[in-house]
């Protein structure tokens, strides 16, 4: 089992190829993998302009808006408008998806997994006081505001806004969260596909 804090200040931003936004990679597997050879990837994306999303054949995607409003268009579907209260939006990375121009830049948590090897779950949770998250193969907990304490066994640390606690190999273990005020966290679980 490993427990690691990924500080927001250490997540460099890189512009999208189409110039319509920025991405901050939080974690990827294998370590150091790029956009063509990852097995799974979690990032923060800021959408600032209209334009198509990159396609990723064989990849399942999840996105969760942290605030604002964003409308997505997919071939053969009605447009979908997401906001800061919307549940995670799942879509295949092979599908052409375009974002309409947001009124102001919006940021989302973006999760991508190679569907033949991994599954992912993404959720927003509000904590006030104490809460627990059940660990999976990989669990990432992103704080929306300062002052979220994360603990597992002998490990403990505090998260500031957009910091992430990453826990690997703690499937079934309880990861404890504590905050002295109501705050949202985003929880990402990634699991390897098991035979049978």
Segments (PLM) and residue ranges:
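Jelly-roll (double-stranded beta-helix
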Residues: 1-196
């Amino acid at each position: 089992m490993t427990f690691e804090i990924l500080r927001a200040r250490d997540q460099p931003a890189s512009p999208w190829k189409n110039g319509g936004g920025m991405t901050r990679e939080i974690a990827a597997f294998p370590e150091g993998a790029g956009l063509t050879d990852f097995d799974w990837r979690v990032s923060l994306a800021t959408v600032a302009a209209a334009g198509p999303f990159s396609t990723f054949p064989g990849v399942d995607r999840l996105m969760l808006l942290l605030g604002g409003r964003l409308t997505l268009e997919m071939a053969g579907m009605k447009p979908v408008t997401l906001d800061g209260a919307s549940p995670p939006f799942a879509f295949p990375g092979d599908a052409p998806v375009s974002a309409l121009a947001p009124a102001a830049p919006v940021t989302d948590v973006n999760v991508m997994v190679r569907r033949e090897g991994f599954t992912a779950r993404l959720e927003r949770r509000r904590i006030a006081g104490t809460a627990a998250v059940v660990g999976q193969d990989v669990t990432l907990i992103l704080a929306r505001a300062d002052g979220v304490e994360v603990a597992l066994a002998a490990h403990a640390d505090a998260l500031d806004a957009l910091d992430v606690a990453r826990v690997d190999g703690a499937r079934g273990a309880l990861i404890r969260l504590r905050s002295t005020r109501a705050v949202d966290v985003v929880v990402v679980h990634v699991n390897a596909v098991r035979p049978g």
